Amino acid sequence: MSDLIQANYRLLRVLPRFGIHLGFGDKSVVEVCRAQGVSMELFLLVCNISTFDDFLPDTAMFKGIDVEDIVLFLQNSHKYYLEQRIPEIRENLSSLEEGPVTSSARILDRFFNDYRNEVEAHFEYEEQTVFPYIRGLIHGVHTEGYSIEQFEENHSNIEDKLEDLKNILIKYLPGEVPAEELNRTLFNVFLLEDDLGRHALIEDK
């Protein structure tokens, strides 16, 4: 397991979503997953998605994995984004407000708050509608008036506003913005955008 983390530090953002924490010594991936009650197949699939930019999973790769494990991982990911990654960027933007470009920073802050609300609504839709529907199908219960095709139609691309935010940060803020704070904010936006894109690959399949 330690070799896996050494090979791709981005997996540090994946481990908590599986309930896996550092300190596993020389244990193998199999041993760590077994100890945490984690599906090794799902864990390795997520690792591949998180590591290789050209890795595109197909539906067949998920067939041997318990759907409940996938749903639980997606729920944990939602919690991770809402409680850690998004507040981190919000804090970055707040630090820009303390500089000499308060008005610009506040515009960014409002823009990001709108984005956060959109993400929360998107996740809430999945948590309250899509996931219960999937769990119902597993147990042979069909929800009248809803189909998975509706999820596909409503699965809006919540990365679009992050693209807009990146453009604002890169192109339009005055030069007086503290470079270190701006770079830190932009870096975290890039990380979130990349992570959400890989998260969407799992949801779509």
Labelled PLM ranges:
Residues 1-205:
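Small-residue-biased structural context
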